[in-house]
Amino acid sequence: MTDALPVREETIFAPASGFGRAAVAVVRVSGPAAGPALDQLAGGRPEPRRLSLRRLRDPGTGNILDQALVAWLPGPATATGEDMAELHLHGGLAVRAAVLRALGRVPGCRPAEAGAFSRRAFLNGRIDLTEAEGIADLIDAETEAQRVQALRQLDGALGRQVAAWRETGIELLAGAEAALDFADEGDVDEDGLDAALAGRAAALRDAIRAALADGRRGERLREGFCVVLAGAPNAGKSTLLNALSGRDAAIVSDIPGTTRDAIEVRCDLGGLPVVLVDTAGLRETADVIEAEGVRRTHHRIRSADLVLHLVPADGEAGPEDFAEVPVLRVRTKSDLPSGAPGEGGLAVSAVTGAGLDALLDAIQGSAASALGGGDALVTRERHREALSRAAGHLDRVATAPAGFPPELVAEDLRLAVRALGEVGGHVGVEEMLDRLFAGFCIGK
């Protein structure tokens, strides 16, 4: 049994297109054996970066597998930074399976795991970690605003800004360490150096804090604007959820307490991701299971971006307090004879559709105000946490009192630079790489 090759010496291959039947199937190969794989299957390597029509043959039997377009992409100017090859096959399942089996028999080649190509691009410096996250977000994007935000990340919007901040931090650190080295020189104006260092640290801190002061728009856009439907039992929450989402997502019944657990439905409202959440009716109950549902309802309300407080048109609002989050009062069942609209809120009928367009417009307006148009720099909690730490260290430098030990100033600057490096994946991120790339598609 031979020893396993180091990761950088292995060659990986995988379909880069969907797994179903299609007109064309694309197979990618990356690594030092990509060229030899073409030699064995395609009879040689075509001119670099030009598609060439070739007969693909099984290297073991010589049998023809397919007539395909092949491309030879020598590194390092490739997506992964390595030698690469692409095989554009006919999209039949049997054709693709036969070619993948043949590639598996090429020495040094093995099937790729999820995210393996993007991981190699990151490890070889073709993309930074924020751009890799942009790829993941683009794959997961369900709405136009999510697509726009993901493309900004993939284009390096955050990565370039953080790299510039990190470069400034490195310059400050170099100045602080130089001041330490020449501290014994009598002609050094230590007070002037300290003031200049504090001023530049404050400016860098303020720039980072400005990016953080965005109301968490980036994270909320990735996760979806959360709208919780809350109210007493039989207020029409499940019926309204089904009407707003256009499908029977929740069970509707006249029996109070039918909904016990939260039901989520993801929607696209004007290109914005919205998550509608049906919840258990709010009331005092001796039923242990229903009481747990009510407890979970209160938890969802506290974490919501918007609460739709549903009250039947002929009912009372009740004593519920939703002061912690934005609330929109909705008068339901306006089609009933007794449904004279009460004061305040939007009157809707999930049965006739009356008022639903106005309600959707109101939800979309709230989502647009909260999420923006995909222009946020910070899109993940990981970014926010690292940038907050960097700003904290810079704040200590900027506000250090006279006589503060210069060694501690330098250490704070060093920690700020390290925190900024974590955002782009330059330091301290090994433990989260597996989680990130495991969420990618095979062949990405």
Swiss-Prot record:
GO molecular function, one term: GTPase activity
GO cellular component: cytoplasm
Coiled-coil intervals, chain numbering: none
Annotated TrmE-type G domain residues: 224-368
Top-level EC class as recorded in UniProt: hydrolase
Matching Gene3D superfamilies: P-loop containing nucleotide triphosphate hydrolases, Probable tRNA modification gtpase trme, domain 1, tRNA modification GTPase MnmE domain 2
Ligand binding (Mg(2+)): S238, T259
Residues the entry annotates as binding K(+): N234, S253, I255, T258
Keyword field contains RNA-binding: no
Residues annotated as binding GTP: 234-239, 253-259, 278-281
Cofactor note: Binds 1 potassium ion per subunit.
Cellular location(s): Cytoplasm
Stored SUPFAM superfamilies: P-loop containing nucleoside triphosphate hydrolases, TrmE connector domain
Biological process annotations from GO: tRNA methylation; tRNA wobble uridine modification
HAMAP family found in the cross-reference section: GTPase_MnmE (MF_00379)
NCBIfam families xref list: PRK05291.1-3 (NF003661), small_GTP (TIGR00231)
PANTHER family: TRNA MODIFICATION GTPASE GTPBP3, TRNA MODIFICATION GTPASE GTPBP3, MITOCHONDRIAL
Purpose of the protein: Exhibits a very high intrinsic GTPase hydrolysis rate. Involved in the addition of a carboxymethylaminomethyl (cmnm) group at the wobble position (U34) of certain tRNAs, forming tRNA-cmnm(5)s(2)U34.
SUBUNIT field: Homodimer. Heterotetramer of two MnmE and two MnmG subunits.
Family label: Belongs to the TRAFAC class TrmE-Era-EngA-EngB-Septin-like GTPase superfamily. TrmE GTPase family.
Name the record gives this protein: tRNA modification GTPase MnmE
Organism from which the protein derives: Methylorubrum populi (strain ATCC BAA-705 / NCIMB 13946 / BJ001)
